[in-house]
Amino acid sequence: MTQETITTDVVIVGAGPCGLFAVFELGLLDMKCHLVDILDKPGGQCAELYPEKPIYDIPALPVVSGHELTERLMEQAAPFGPQYHYNEMVEEVQKLEDGRWRVKTDGGLVFEAKVVVIAAGGGSFQPKKPPIPGIEAYEGKSVFYAVKRMETFRGKNVLISGGGDSALDWTINLHPIVQSMQLIHRRDGFRAAPDSVNKMHALVEEKKMQFHLGQITSLHGDNGQLEGVTVKGNDGADYQIECDTLLPFFGLTMKLGPIANWGINLHENLIPVDTEKFQTSEPGLFAIGDINTYPGKLKLILSGFHEAALMAQAAFRYANPDAKLTFQYTTSSTSLQKKLGVA
């Protein structure tokens, strides 16, 4: 059976914060959006990897979780009726003779749109796993590479391994609810915010947690339940650490996947864009958020919001070259307020 083609103004690849806010900005310009995401829910990396981790640099929100931010963005986009397609990976993006784009997914969906916006974060992320023999047997049971629900770890004896921001942040955020908290790193220098490092050292001094120097060489347990680990200390001696949960945080590996085959210019697995339109090397194909690169780029959610606003203006002009675009403010425009359902 032939899949019916879905016709729309815009296809957004990625339903993370930048993709969701792009719906709002495009909606103000009467552009209808379909979003496609490989995950089974909205929020992208923000919701998948750290849904309960506090975010502190969203304007007007002193602190917000990834989950709450996603919910608010969904609510903000709702008046424009976006359509979401989860568990779908965009495999092919092809420009048609009439200037529109044909987008195909691995699940058989076919779209035709005037504009395509790539808001796929860094592509798909996979955790870098430590080279510990047999760790696969514990994964998802007592070894976890991300904290999706803090309550999962309440009352546990947790060992966190790593020296970056994720390791330090979760050491600090989880310690109030766990039975015991231990952190292990191969050296006493950290690749994390100095404030987080200071907080961790303070917890150690207050005997609220322990810090170890060394590397984990083996795991001990039964039927996927961890009971402890063997560590080779920096002095070369082996010793044991008792724990029932291990959180290794060694960073993420980014994979572009099919994006690399879409015929657009790439630079170090990122998509170069201009900072006026956030357009790629292909007219009508835009990129916002962590997937793009330009001089002075900051990989921040708030930067992606700015990019979405400018992209939307350029996307409208590309899709409607003969239309007049009058800039309006939501605070004073009755027509925009009607679209938002507040007038």
UniProtKB/Swiss-Prot annotation:
Cofactor(s) needed: FAD
Keyword set includes Oxidoreductase: yes
Sequence similarity: Belongs to the ferredoxin--NADP reductase type 2 family.
Subunit structure: Homodimer.
Protein's UniProt keywords contain NADP: yes
Keywords recorded for this protein, A-Z: FAD, Flavoprotein, NADP, Oxidoreductase
Annotated binding of FAD, by residue: 18, 37, 45, 50, 90, 125, 290, 331
E.C. no: 1.18.1.2
Protein name per its UniProtKB record: Ferredoxin--NADP reductase
Catalytic activity: 2 reduced [2Fe-2S]-[ferredoxin] + NADP(+) + H(+) = 2 oxidized [2Fe-2S]-[ferredoxin] + NADPH
Enzyme class: oxidoreductase
MF GO annotations: ferredoxin-NADP+ reductase activity; flavin adenine dinucleotide binding; NADP binding
Bound cofactor: record note: Binds 1 FAD per subunit.
InterPro entries from the UniProt entry: FAD/NAD-bd_sf, FAD/NAD-binding_dom, Fd--NADP_Rdtase_type_2, Ferredoxin-NADP_redctase_2
